[in-house]
A protein has these predicted regions:
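Short, basic, low-complexity termini and linkers enriched in Ser/Thr/Gly/Pro
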Residues: 215, 220, 225-228
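Catalytic cores of DNA base-excision repair glycosylases
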Residues: 2-215
Length: 228
């Protein structure tokens, strides 16, 4: 870790000491469902949808017994009918292969329909308290702009951040980067003028943020988000 990276992580911790998940969930099943729904959708929208979902489908067994056609009206405002199909299919696999219990390993989670490394990492970190570094669109964008990573994919970004940041801080750093991405380091118009990280930021110092580059970065972000 170089001096700039150390300053950036310290400042992120100072800025967002109480950063935490903004999705509402209370157990591994709810974490899995909410995270699948959150792909390319705001947490606020997901939080509006999930109370009815969890009321009528309170556990893996109930979800496995329904159909995508029944579930879809509950979640259609979150976009993509594939989300309903994947949620039902994932719960059926959990019933059949894992005794109705959401698995707690990366290998098992990513074997579920519609579950990629990001979704699996969220479940591991926030449902099971296991070390994981979920990389969503905000983490990918902000970490690469700041110089905490230098990668063309979410998978590379995940590996680089895990190598850079102490394991005990992975989940916290995930939230620091999300908070900063939502509040300051926006995708299209980053508020560099009010960013206290500017003195150490690679993008700010090299004038990396420009419309053409950001268009390509957003394309990469969308590809990564679509892959869960």
């Amino acid at each position: 870790m170089d001096e700039n990276q150390s300053h950036i992580l310290s400042e992120l911790q100072r800025l967002y000491p109480d950063a935490k998940p903004e999705l509402n969930f209370s157990d591994p099943y709810e974490t899995l469902v909410a995270t699948i729904l959150s792909a390319q959708c705001t947490d606020q929208r997901v939080n509006m949808v999930t109370p009815a979902v969890f009321r009528d489908f309170p556990d893996v067994h109930a979800m496995a017994q329904t159909t995508p056609e029944v579930l879809y009206p509950y979640v259609k405002s979150c976009g993509f009918s594939a989300k309903a199909r994947n949620i039902v299919a994932a719960c059926r696999v959990i019933e059949e292969r894992f005794g109705g219990q959401v698995p707690d390993t990366m290998e098992a989670l990513t074997s579920l329909p519609g579950v990629g490394r990001k979704t699996a990492s969220v479940v591991l970190a926030f449902a099971f308290g296991k070390p994981a570094m979920p990389v969503d669109t905000h983490v990918f964008r902000v970490s690469n702009r700041l110089g905490l990573s230098q990668a063309d994919s979410v998978e590379q970004t995940e590996r680089q951040l895990m190598a850079l940041i102490p394991e005990e801080d992975w989940s916290k750093a995930h939230h620091w980067l999300i908070y900063h991405g939502r509040r300051v380091c926006h995708s299209q118009k980053p508020d560099c003028g009010h960013c206290t990280l500017s003195p150490w930021c690679k993008a700010h110092s090299t004038v990396m943020i420009n419309p053409k580059r950001d268009i390509e970065n957003r394309r990469r972000e969308k590809r990564g988000a679509t892959n869960g």
